[in-house]
Amino acid sequence: MGSFSIWHWLIVLVVVLLLFGRGKIPELMGDMAKGIKNFRKGMTDEAEEAKTVEHRTDEPVGEVKQKASKS
């Protein structure tokens, strides 16, 4: 009861083709591929930014320890 037969998949395919047409489906797939590509590019850009974080120390360590011990 929970599995789909070949007839179910054929009906779904016919409905999708009727709704979108033959020309629209490749266009939708191309747009989805572009979206995935941009998402991956964004993820790698963020990872590269995280690697290049600048570590600055404006205050000497001793002063920071004193401030931390006072709080």
Curated annotation (Swiss-Prot):
One of its GO terms (biological process) is protein transport by the Tat complex. InterPro entries: TatA/B/E, TatA/E. Its main location: membrane. Pfam families: TatA_B_E. It comes from Chelativorans sp. (strain BNC1). Part of the twin-arginine translocation (Tat) system that transports large folded proteins containing a characteristic twin-arginine motif in their signal peptide across membranes. TatA could form the protein-conducting channel of the Tat system. NCBIfam families: PRK00720.1, tatAE. The chain crosses the membrane at residues 1-21. The Tat system comprises two distinct complexes: a TatABC complex, containing multiple copies of TatA, TatB and TatC subunits, and a separate TatA complex, containing only TatA subunits. Substrates initially bind to the TatABC complex, which probably triggers association of the separate TatA complex to form the active translocon. Belongs to the TatA/E family. This is Sec-independent protein translocase protein TatA. Residues 49-71 have a biased composition (Basic and acidic residues).
